[in-house]
Amino acid sequence: MSELVTVARPYAKAAFDFAVEHQAVAHWQAMLTFCAEVSRNERIAELLSGAVVPEKLAETFIAVCGEELDAAGQNLIRVMAENGRLTVLPDVLEQFTLWRAAQEATVEVDVISASTLKEEQLAKISAAMEQRLSRKVKLNCKIDKSVVAGVVIRAGDMVIDGSVRGRLERLADVLQS
């Protein structure tokens, strides 16, 4: 089993890097899932383990997959067939899925302030958000003079408004009620 993972890893890594670069991780996971299912089919598995010429094997596999594979996916299948590795497609999918999960463990956090924050301030915000979210964070810093002072932090649907503007708005709401 570990030998198959070792064989599958470079293909999965290449596919994942390509997918990230082209912002198509979900699309690639869907393609790999489909290909892994096709490779598990009894008749296809017999074909993969037989003595078929790699070019013919690749074209047959691509034909079976039909429009589920884009041009880049077809290229991956051709390379894997040429190297006799189509049988490890389920392991390629498994490795790809692990890299996707690791990538998605990072949360993008928007930090909006009235002026540029110092490195120490950014480090404290980053550490606090990592602890609060239990995930790694990537800070996207933006400057908005209307904040007046303080910061507004957004991570997904969570907003922490520590700005003077936010405090004034809350004070105005209290006074009007």
Swiss-Prot record:
Domain of life, source organism: Bacteria
Topology of the protein relative to the lipid bilayer: Peripheral membrane protein
Keyword Metal-binding set for record: no
Any one Pfam family match given in the protein's UniProt record, by short name: OSCP
GO MF term list: proton-transporting ATP synthase activity, rotational mechanism
NCBIfam families tied to this protein: ATP_synt_delta, PRK05758.2-2, PRK05758.2-5
Protein name: ATP synthase subunit delta
Naturally occurring in which organism (per UniProt): Sodalis glossinidius (strain morsitans)
Gene that produces this protein: atpH
